Amino acid sequence: METKNIRYIADAWKEYKQHFVKQSSMAAYLLLLNKHILPEFGNCTELPEHEVQSFVLRKIKGGISAKTVKDILIVLKMIVHYGAKNGWINNYSWDIKYPANEQKKELDVMSTDNFKQVLAYLQKNFTFQGLGIIITMNTGMRIGEICGLQWGDIDMDTNCISVQRTVERIYVMEGDKKYTKLVVNTPKTQNSCRQIPMSKDLLALVKPLMKVVNKSYYVLSNSDKPIEPRTYRNYYKDLLAQLGIPDLKFHGLRHSFATKCIEAGCDYKTVSVLLGHANISTTLNLYVHPNADQKKRCIDKMLKSLGK
């Protein structure tokens, strides 16, 4: 076996991998590679489990989330697997442990009163960017998806919105050159490409506009150029401040939509499909947390079915 270090293998892996993934995915891989993997393991020709485990614990202790660390390991494993296929390094099967979370952080959602206040204000003070917030609150779309929404994605025959593109700014590395660029891409997964029915209120708001807009234009800008997510986040943040509403991340609107669906008794599979989750377990883990009363009703319902 002709042993090579991780830096050499990573260079070869990059040339190979870029042909099979989206540019945005490759950009995310390279960011993790250059920021975390190469500084730690670039010169290594062996990666025993204890070294990787120590790396994981140091990163988490340093304030990096377990999710990000897991993403780093996914990239590292891809590189090692590629190197092993080429006979440059042993193929390792690490059993990495992560510190137990002391307390699962609750999702930040908008209160019902604030939710109604935002909708009422935006309906009374119409702008195209404001319409994007209304659509997000009615559909749970991601910020990149709402930035990528075009008028032609709104079907007045089916009364549905078709999610089929996303806008994102990616980090690009080309040799010594490092820069960012805005890209319009397909959504993050196959499940993210989806049809979302419009509510009666949203339909009434959009219907008159559809007679006069250019179907190839982006909804938020009403032009052929999209608004980028960072700019739209700033608009949203300023809107909340203007209305005196506590700061909430834009993604909190998606959480709010999903939470209100679950609280209203919508079935979990339908909510999962509306959100574009890859599988229903993501929806269940994020949004379904039965309280004591719900658990009691469940048991009572089961016993009632048995005639008890």
Stretches found by the model and what they are:
Residues C160-V163, V219, K260, S272-P290, ...:
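Short functional hotspots where side chains directly engage DNA or cofactors
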Residues E2-K4, K14-Y82, N86-W88, K104, ...:
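N-terminal core-binding DNA-recognition domain of tyrosine site-specific recombinases/integrases
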Residues P197-P246:
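Active-site/catalytic core of tyrosine-dependent DNA strand-transfer enzymes
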Residues K67, K85, I134, N138-E145, ...:
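C-terminal catalytic core of tyrosine-transesterase DNA break-rejoin enzymes
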